[in-house]
Amino acid sequence: MLIKEYHILLPMSLDEYQVAQLYMIQKKSREESSGEGSGVEILANRPYTDGPGGNGQYTHKVYHVGSHIPGWFRALLPKAALQVEEESWNAYPYTRTRYTCPFVEKFSIEIETYYLPDGGQQPNVFNLSGAERRQRIVDTIDIVRDAVAPGEYKAEEDPRLYRSAKTGRGPLADDWARTAAQTGPLMCAYKLCKVEFRYWGMQAKIEQFIHDVGLRRVMLRAHRQAWCWQDEWIELSMADIRALEEETARMLAQRMAKCNTGSEGPEAQTPGKSSTEARPGTSTAGTPDGPEAPPGPDASPDASFGKQWSSSSRSSYSSQHGGGVSPQSLSEWRMQNIARDSENSSEEEFFDAHEGFSDSDEVFPKEMTKWNSNDFIDAFASPTEVEGVPDPTVMATKGIEDGARAPRDSEGLDGAGDLVVEACSVHALFLILHSGSILDSGPGDTNSKQADVQTLSTAFEAVTRVHFPEALGHVALRLVPCPPICAAAYALVSNLSPYSHDGDSLSRSQDHIPLAALPLLATSSSRYQGAVATVIARTNQAYAAFLRSSEGTGFCGQVVLIGDGVGGILGFDALCHSASAGPGSRGSSRRGSMNNEMLSPEVGPVRDPLADGVEVLGRASPEPSALPAQRTFSDMANPDPDGSQNSLQVASTATSSGEPRRASTASCPPASSEAPDGPTNAARLDFKVSGFFLFGSPLGLVLALRKTVMPALEVAQLRPACEQIYNLFHAADPCASRLEPLLAPKFQAIAPLAVPRYQKFPLGDGSSLLLADTLQTHSSLFLEELEMMVPSTPTSASGAFWKGSELGNEPASQTAAPSTTSEVVKILDRWWGNKRIDYSLYCPEALTAFPTVTLPHLFHASYWESADVVAFILRQVIEKERPQLTECEEPSIYSPAFPREKWQRKRTQVKIRNVTSNHRASDTVVCEGRPQVLNGRFMYGPLDVVTLTGEKVDVYVMTQPLSGKWIHFGTEVTNSSGRLTFPVPSERALGIGVYPVRMVVRGDHTYAECCLTVVSRGTEAVVFSIDGSFTASVSIMGSDPKVRAGAVDVVRHWQDSGYLIVYVTGRPDMQKHRVVAWLSQHNFPHGVVSFCDGLTHDPLRQKAMFLQSLVQEVELNIVAGYGSPKDVAVYAALGLSPSQTYIVGRAVRKLQAQCQFLSDGYVAHLGQLEAGSHSHAPSGPPRAALAKSSYAVAAPVDFLRKQSQLLRSRGPSQVDREGPGTPPTTLARGKTRSISLKLDSEE
């Protein structure tokens, strides 16, 4: 729901305004009702008593809005849904208006208005709650200074020009409000408008459209008219107004009756009747004020659009079950299904916009900039597009005081100067390549593009504020408008439609437009080359403008590109050209050179204009200089039958060298502000691109066409100048296509990765996005000749083809087939990044029943408001930020409260100079009400060779884990052995829950992390021995142990059943980072982890002591234990019965009476647990639920990846350069080199 409070000032008294308002409404109803699709019917207008506001006038109207709704959206709706009913209660100076449409149950508008004799200074007229006030946007409408739409301006309605002949008032100057406040009269209409449209993919866009076009635009014009028509109403009384209203009602009834009789027949009468049948439970959120939210075509379309659609749609139900299925009933069924989908799947899961945060205190930004969705009006006159880059849309991350007005567009850049800071606070710049939907027929409206970017910006802030607080204020968005290259193709294909000659609605309701052909035709045009050059120039302009702005001064962060369907194609080719145009291009390899000719038949084989002036291609023979320089960028995919050496510029960027895939950072002259006619020598991006996100782009089809017309072309050779490409799409999107099968054909058998739903997994579900992990999981597809010894399960992927010698003793598993191994290496080398490329987004199944021609608009709108998309992007960008630290730095993602200080001891700086931190803190479990004590040890070096003695350590606790805010609890000094004990003050004792703890060394900001778990008495727990119950291979030699099949599922079953998970291991605590990272790598559920205190000869004794302390001091009730035969005695000492002790592995005869051996493995055991799940429910006292999550969610760790094996063919030097991988995000970076008991090796 979008809530705005409008303040409308007028220089008149309240009594005058009452007459002016009612006169204006009835006059606009007369003038702007033209009949079917645009008009107003007044069904009732009578006084009431004891209603809203006391006694007043009740009005019931029907708005006809069909002609004011975009054609693609109109195709989704039956005619009955194009009528909106309005009920208003006017108890002046209080009014209330409600718009209803039973057909669209999850759409509602509600407006409350107070008319007060002041200047609009009252901050909370409507007594809103704190959450509502944070969500509310205050917008002051100035009838003089605010601009009206170009097609609506009339000189006689301009307050700057109007002077009343009867009252002598006017004209009004720009400072009229200040003058009226001093001299009077002055009044203010406070209008609280609530708009809700809870349908997937359209929520944010339509809610904002209703506010900006249906409410604000209508109210601005209506109040300008009310002022400028004062000579007509100044002498009227309320009795005269009522008489005019009755006359208007009769006139409108006659006009609509004629129209209905001539076109619709009796169906038009249904709306009026159905209004009395409207269900009282229909959602009625709000929008513009009833009386003013005018009746006319301007008002009604917008307001009407916001209003609701007549319940006469129910009449189609009978026709659906009567004789045949009509198009109207099909439309009803589609919308009902999309609404029903939302109900069945729970609204929190179904609606992808960030609406769900309305009740949170810290969710809503304090400032939300206004924007206009003018693209929803088909015939709206938009100003000519200005060459160059429009006013940038900046993410509203810097809050303002509550109630402050959102800045006007003209004030946006001026205000930016106030945001100057000493250092650039922006760490990631997003450049949005926005071209529009492939079905856009016009030149593209800049305001519409800015509206989409503002929607994305709002979604960014909402998600960032809740789950990525470290990124708040460090992200900026800029719009790069791209040419609508598909417009000409759409016009051409529309003319070829079998129904192009038919003007009725049949052609709109049928899917006769081949959507897949549009991008293919567009990229084959002779003008496509210029479009790519224009995109490069505008992108460079946007980047340069950002650097010149106060926000971008000193910017040195990463630049990310986001491209919509068409913008993604243009951006991809721009990146490919940038990769080949830069100095030292990889295109110098002969391998990348391809023969080609023009795709367009009218132009013969010519030189690629994008390659003009670029002499780094290393062709075998020079190209003739006499060849003309005109050629389309897309035509580079054609073979040259004459065998000429015309090289495919885009394809020529790929080589077999091991050079890193990154854009050249060499400087180049800035692009000109005007879009060039053709690419120049400097037609490349001026900056390095870290990631490129595609939103439903048909890029795969375009590349497939180039591959088809040029069989010798290898798509993988089109190396875009970015580090990673992410192809996001909905499975039902008819415009989207995959990319991975073009790079590796066998990926057609591998499903795209599913982007986790934000409502369930805001920080991700722990699934690995790495290409190497996918190749490992699906190794059977790529290593067919290799015998796999360990089955691949959802929780355990065999690493057979990475380390053939570790599978077993069989000779077949010693080495992999050379051909298949080289294929895997080839895929890794040719891939566009190190992660998967194709990602599938959630969409309702009901969308498959919608007309195909309506889906491109719907899906294009859905990306900008999708919290799933925003959270996914933030996870990738923030993850990208963390590995950029140097090896001696810590991956801290927050700013500690205290800056670095000098060491307390002078020797400390010398002792730790060449060693890496290996701090660790023990997970602590305490019973509620008992003292809470945290313990940590601060050491440096792989074997704890240096002890941090006598230094300050700050203790931070995340008291609200979802908030991401670290609270400083205190400071302690380490003792002579590097240990620290910190008792939590009693006044700050924490309640039941799991709390992350971070202990930060004041001197260098390295830190240790652990969890403080507070439980109630009698909490039931399950214990797992890591080495005894999880590992399927011995890890003494330093290899990464495999996970037993089904182990993760068993642990997750116990956690889902409500038990506390406890992990124990006999490994020394110096290996904590590696063990927890291993658990994270395999998605084990979060739990308490216990280690031995240093190296010990009796680890079982320490295990037993730890578990005994849990039972005696914490009062845990351990109900089951898993481990190896060595752990039987430990569990027996705890009092566990044989039926509660589960041992994995071969049965030992002497222990058969003391435990249960799981000889059939975890998979069979899990089936037994699930079959008797009712008997495993916790029987303890009721308690607050502890967090249920995976280690991989809290700490996406990938520094355990076996890069030494994955990259073996690339040579040891590159492995050394790239390092062992990425450190865990919530674990201190450790480079432990233990002599024994290692989980992984580091080269």
Curated annotation (Swiss-Prot):
Chain positions found as Phosphothreonine: T59, T282, T287
Pfam families: DDHD (PF02862), IP_trans (PF02121), LNS2_PITM1-3 (PF24694), PITM1-3 (PF24695)
Catalytic activity: a 1,2-diacyl-sn-glycero-3-phospho-(1D-myo-inositol)(in) = a 1,2-diacyl-sn-glycero-3-phospho-(1D-myo-inositol)(out)
Localisation: Cytoplasm; Golgi apparatus, Golgi stack membrane; Endoplasmic reticulum membrane; Lipid droplet
Topology of the protein relative to the lipid bilayer: Peripheral membrane protein
Biased amino acid composition, Polar residues: 271-283, 643-658
Omega-N-methylarginine carried by residues: R1210, R1217
Biased composition (Low complexity): 299-319, 581-593
GO cellular component term, pick one: cytosol
Modified residues (Phosphoserine): 300, 304, 319, 326, 329, 342, 345-346, 373, 382, 593, 600, 621, 895, 1236
Distribution of this protein across tissues and organs: Detected at high levels in brain, and at lower levels in lung, kidney, spleen and liver (at protein level). Ubiquitous. Highly expressed in embryonic retina and the central nervous system.
Domain of life: Eukaryota
Residue ranges of every copy of the DDHD domain listed in the record: 684-878
InterPro entries in alphabetical order: DDHD_dom, HAD-like_sf, HAD_sf, LNS2/PITP, PI_transfer, PI_transfer_N, START-like_dom_sf
Protein family according to the UniProt entry: Belongs to the PtdIns transfer protein family. PI transfer class IIA subfamily.
Protein name: Membrane-associated phosphatidylinositol transfer protein 1
Organism of this sequence: Mus musculus
Name of the gene this protein is made from: Pitpnm1
